[in-house]
């Protein structure tokens, strides 16, 4: 599935392999003096074209992302960096993408535009030709006292004007309206997205993180995820992730890197 390059202090890598009863035979190890230098070295290898993706190991997320977003020698592009979960929930008939639950704390309108664009790109990569994007809030009407509803409406107009392409976008939608056709019908909501969403865009990180974890721990969902918007996909694993989730995230990175590139 992947050809790993292990980056960090060799002694720590070998100790971890011994604990996991894993062989390092044939694997490239790029040694660094300290663990915190591993992210910087990994970013440098990407910039030299030697790596196609990054995967967080035992480093803290902020150590990895600090090296990625550094203006002088990081991996930033014209896009805002964001995280997308791909969730397989038993009660939903298809894969569900949830964003952003890990990177952007309180994204503004411009950031949300890129968050939507990144999620559409990943949906395309996993075979959803024209994803249905639900912009979530607490209610399905535009309310002046709820800023996320105003931003949701603005994102829909951006899609109408060609500022976001590749998907059908509707919002604001409450969570039930986004995933349940019955709930959408009860509220009189008629759209191609309502009740049949492929992508759920949370109003902020707190809402997105809670939603994703509820689906995992209460609904028995399986997850994978990627950070997008950088030069290469970043597999940002959590300490709570099991082996299946980590492998699925590697598969996502492969699919994303192999996707057809469309100028937009």
Feature map (PLM): residue ranges:
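Anion-binding alpha/beta catalytic cores of soluble intermediary-metabolism enzymes, centered on
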Residues: 1-193, 198-264
């Amino acid at each position: 599935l992947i050809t790993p390059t292990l980056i960090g202090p060799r002694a720590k890598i070998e100790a971890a392999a011994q604990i996991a009863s894993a062989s390092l035979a044939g694997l490239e190890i790029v040694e660094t003096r300290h663990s915190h230098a591993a992210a910087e070295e990994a970013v440098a290898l990407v910039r030299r074209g030697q790596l196609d993706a990054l995967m967080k190991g035992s480093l803290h997320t902020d150590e990895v992302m600090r090296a990625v977003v550094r203006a002088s020698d990081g991996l930033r592009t014209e896009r805002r960096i964001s995280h997308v979960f791909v969730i397989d929930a038993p009660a939903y008939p298809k894969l569900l993408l949830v964003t952003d639950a890990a990177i952007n704390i309180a994204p503004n309108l411009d950031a949300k535009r890129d968050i939507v664009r990144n999620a559409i790109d990943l949906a395309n990569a996993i075979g959803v030709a024209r994803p249905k994007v639900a912009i979530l809030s607490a209610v399905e009407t535009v309310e002046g006292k709820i800023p996320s509803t105003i931003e949701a409406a603005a994102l829909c107009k951006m899609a109408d004007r060609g500022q976001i392409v590749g998907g059908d976008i509707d919002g604001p939608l409450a969570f039930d309206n986004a995933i349940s056709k019955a709930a959408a019908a009860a509220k009189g909501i008629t759209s191609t997205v309502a009740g049949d969403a492929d992508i759920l865009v949370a109003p902020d990180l707190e809402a997105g993180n809670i939603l994703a974890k509820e689906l995992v721990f209460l609904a028995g969902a399986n997850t994978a995820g990627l950070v997008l918007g950088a030069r290469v996909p970043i597999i940002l694993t959590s300490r709570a992730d099991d082996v299946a989730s980590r492998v699925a995230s590697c598969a996502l990175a492969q699919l994303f890197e192999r996707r057809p590139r469309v100028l937009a």
